[in-house]
C-alpha cells in the first residue's frame, strides 16, 4: 500500500507524515512531496524511525515522481489561516494549488483514493472533482474532503463537558467543513443528554474551533497538529478498508445523491474501492433540522465557487 502526502513540509504535512510513518501497516510505502526544498530532508529525518514503512521525499514543481503507484493521496498543500481570516479567504491561493496537484494525480495515479485537507474544503473538493472529470478519471467513490477534525473536536469537547472518555465517543458530523456548514449530530450520541443551551454552545464551539486555535497561536499558524492527527486517522481508516477490513466507517465530505447539496459530509462505509455505502444521516432533532436547512445556501455557494473556478 502506497500513501502519498502532498504538502508534506507544512505544519499539517509533517505531523501527518510522522503519524503515518509510525502507524501505517508493515510493508507500506510513504511518499512525501512539497514544493519546499526541505522535503527530502523531512523524509530522511523520518526514515530514522524504526518502523517497516519505506519513505521517500520529493521537492520542486513536479509531484509526479511522488505519485507513481500511489493508492492513497492526501493533499494538505496550501497557505494557512491567519487571525481575521476565515477559511474562504484562503480560496484565492489554495484553489490554484489544488487544481495543479489534482491535474498531476489525474495523469499519474488516476485510480488512487484522494483525501483533500487543503481549505476551504467545501470548495477545494468541488475543484478536484471538476478537474478529475475533465481528465475523464473522476470516480465519486474515491474523492473525499477530510472533515475528521470536526469529529475529533466533537468527541473531545463532548467528553470534557460530560466527563466521558473521548475514545468511547464517535459524534457524527454532517454538512461541510467551515462555520455554519459544520453540524455535529449531538442528538445521536447514545446515553448522552444535553440541555438546549449545551447543544447551542457546543455546536458553536465545534464550528468555531479552528478560529480558537488561530487566535491562540497569535498569528503563528492554524490547527496543524490536531489536523495532522485527524488526517492520519482518516488515511489509516482508508488504508485498512482498501486492504479488506470490514466495517470501517468515517464521516467525510463527498459527492452523494444530491439530496442536500452536490457534496455533503456524512457517515461512509469504506471498502476496497473507496466508498462502499453512503450511510443515512438518521433522525435529526428540531435544532439540527433547522441548522441543516439554514446551512445549505452557504454550502451550495461554496461548491459553485469551486465548479466555476475550473470551468470558467
Curated annotation (Swiss-Prot):
Domain of life: Bacteria
Gene Ontology BP annotations: malate metabolic process; tricarboxylic acid cycle
Pfam families associated with the record: Ldh_1_C, Ldh_1_N
InterPro entries, A to Z: L-lactate/malate_DH, Lactate/malate_DH_C, Lactate/malate_DH_N, Lactate_DH/Glyco_Ohase_4_C, Malate_DH_AS, Malate_DH_type1, Malate_DH_type1_bac, NAD(P)-bd_dom_sf
Residues holding NAD(+): 7-13, 34, 94, 117-119, 227
One GO CC term, this protein: cytoplasm
EC number: 1.1.1.37
The entry's keywords: NAD, Oxidoreductase, Tricarboxylic acid cycle
Active site feature: 177
Positions with a binding annotation for substrate: 81, 87, 119, 153
One GO MF term: L-malate dehydrogenase (NAD+) activity
Enzyme class of the recorded protein, top EC level: oxidoreductase
Reaction catalyzed: (S)-malate + NAD(+) = oxaloacetate + NADH + H(+)
Gene3D superfamilies from the UniProt entry: Lactate dehydrogenase/glycoside hydrolase, family 4, C-terminal (3.90.110.10), NAD(P)-binding Rossmann-like Domain (3.40.50.720)
Biological function: Catalyzes the reversible oxidation of malate to oxaloacetate.
Family: Belongs to the LDH/MDH superfamily. MDH type 1 family.
Complexes and interactors: Homodimer.
Name of the protein described by the UniProt record: Malate dehydrogenase
Lineage of producing organism: Bacteria, Pseudomonadati, Pseudomonadota, Gammaproteobacteria, Enterobacterales
